[in-house]
Amino acid sequence: MIKPVQTELYAVIGNPVAHSLSPVMMNAAFRSMNVPATYLALQADELPEDLETLARFGFRGLSVTLPHKELAYRLADHVDDMARTIGAVNTLMREGSAWIGCNTDWLGATKALRRVTELEGREALILGAGGAARAVAFGMKREGARVTIANRCVEKGKALAKSFRCDFIPLAILDRARFDRHFDVVVQCTSVGLQGTIPTVLVSDSFFEPGMVVMETVYRPLRTPFLNAAKRAGATIVHGTDMLVYQGVAQLEWWLSRPIPEFPCVAAMKQAIHEVLSKEKNAQDD
């Protein structure tokens, strides 16, 4: 007798969301572990109503991306201690009639950075003051870095800096010729450089130095103008895909209540992303 396959539903929600590599990455992970699940990309414009709709359709878990991470924190029925401290969630799980929230961005960011540098005692600069910046600031402080926030909106940047007891500088100061403060680690946490957005320059090329570690949270395109400028200056660059993978691993561990093995699962996630980005690069070269 034919029986329907029970498939759990997951999705990334945000706006824009068409650029997201999460479906490719997460579906590769599910296949590698023989987990009967499907992961979609869904544009969400009205988050309160959208969460109700997704609950009715039986979605088990959600990845939350721009611009909803702080709102998702406020809408979640319960959040864990880390998310409460950060004030943003990038992960939701349905338990009974409630949405439970946590944050894995900080785990993804710190793991990606620790692969190339120590963070304790380092001077770190975070560009941006949204949900991703909040998570990265939390993670960097937790690792013992001395964190400074730079943001165009002074009020929002100062509020974030106050929350985590960080320094704050207006973003415009970084382009001044006489700005001579040194940073060991720089993390770009805005949507600038995202595929399909209007090109914007955050900092001048002269800001970057040899020996800096520069990480991008945007992952499509793989090499943003921000990362290209850092690379030309001799900095060590960390792609946004590294953070994407490691925060995704933490999401899977939370949703599935099990460890996620490097092989075959994490390797499959990385390979799936690599294949998509390689095809895009080849198409551009043609």
UniProtKB/Swiss-Prot annotation:
Question: What species is given as this protein's source?
Answer: Syntrophobacter fumaroxidans (strain DSM 10017 / MPOB)
Signal peptide feature range: none
Does the keyword section mention Transmembrane helix?
Answer: no
Keywords, comma-separated and alphabetical? Amino-acid biosynthesis, Aromatic amino acid biosynthesis, NADP, Oxidoreductase
Q: Please tell me where NADP(+) binds in this chain.
A: 81, 128-132, 217, 240
Instruction: Please list the residues that bind shikimate.
Output: 20-22, 65, 90, 105, 219
Q: In which pathway does this enzyme or protein participate?
A: Metabolic intermediate biosynthesis; chorismate biosynthesis; chorismate from D-erythrose 4-phosphate and phosphoenolpyruvate: step 4/7
User: What does the annotation say about its assembly with partners?
Assistant: Homodimer.
Q: What Gene Ontology molecular function terms does this protein carry?
A: NADP binding; shikimate 3-dehydrogenase (NADP+) activity
Which family, according to UniProt? Belongs to the shikimate dehydrogenase family.
Question: What is the protein name stated in its UniProt record?
Answer: Shikimate dehydrogenase (NADP(+))
Q: Tell me, what does this protein do in biology? A: Involved in the biosynthesis of the chorismate, which leads to the biosynthesis of aromatic amino acids. Catalyzes the reversible NADPH linked reduction of 3-dehydroshikimate (DHSA) to yield shikimate (SA).
Enzyme type, top EC level: oxidoreductase
Query: Catalytic activity annotated for this protein?
Result: shikimate + NADP(+) = 3-dehydroshikimate + NADPH + H(+)
Q: Which residues are annotated as active site?
A: 69 (proton acceptor)
InterPro entries for this protein: Aminoacid_DH-like_N_sf, NAD(P)-bd_dom_sf, SDH_C, Shikimate_DH, Shikimate_DH-bd_N, Shikimate_DH_fam, Shikm_DH/Glu-tRNA_Rdtase
BP term (GO), one: aromatic amino acid family biosynthetic process
Q: Give the matching Gene3D superfamilies.
A: Leucine Dehydrogenase, chain A, domain 1 (3.40.50.10860), NAD(P)-binding Rossmann-like Domain (3.40.50.720)
Superkingdom, natural source: Bacteria
Q: What is the lineage of its organism?
A: Bacteria, Pseudomonadati, Thermodesulfobacteriota, Syntrophobacteria, Syntrophobacterales
Q: What is its EC number?
A: 1.1.1.25
